[in-house]
Amino acid sequence: MTSEPTSQLAEGAKIWVICGSSCAGKTTTARLLARRLPLAAHVEGDEMQRLIVSGCRWAVPGDSDPVTGRLTGEAGVQYALRIRNACLVAAAFADAGITAIVTDTTINEGFESLIEVLGGRLVNFVVLRPSVAVLRQRGIDRLPEEAAYLADRYDDSDHPEAAEFAGRVQAAADGRPVNEFEQIVERGLDRLPRIGLWLDPSGMDPQSVVDLLLDRRAEAAWMVGADQLSR
């Protein structure tokens, strides 16, 4: 159950939301942050998506409306659903006294899902926005690690997540940006209201990023409200 706003402000936020593009450092930051807190859980949006065993639809650049940037079709439905589910899990943890750290891109319909589920709660909202050059280099550097992960997880090269990864490998071979969805996410971040703490972690090591988040958590605090929908 959500406590009163004044009580939440006194106690501090029990939910963190860390968003940004792929390779922005969300997962690494969240895991390190969780270890620095006395009782904390990491709720990863991608893991919510992976709960869909059959019919899973990972978004690709062609799924985005060129005008609004919103995802269309089943990809959009599943994207909004995974963030909704991540926020529901985070709320359950928070109500049990466990700090929850949610990570996902959290733009457009995903941000609306967050508003719907976490409205009236105090959240530490963080946007990680490294430079585009850093994002692209990290995308290339992560390919071997992701290949090993997917090989261990799936025995089917036609699995949607494996197929999406194969597209990024081909992009690297062609000299194109590894994550072509990056531009869509960046435009979505531009449409977010300027709430919480926005940080360019380019050139920072992960521990320093966490130090900064803890030192500046008051700047990240945001009382979630429906009047703050993205532009």
Residue ranges and their predicted role:
Residues 145-209, 225-231:
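Small-molecule kinase domains that catalyze NTP-dependent phosphoryl transfer to phosphate-bearing small molecules
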Residues 18:
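Hydrophobic anchor at the beta1->P-loop junction of P-loop NTPases
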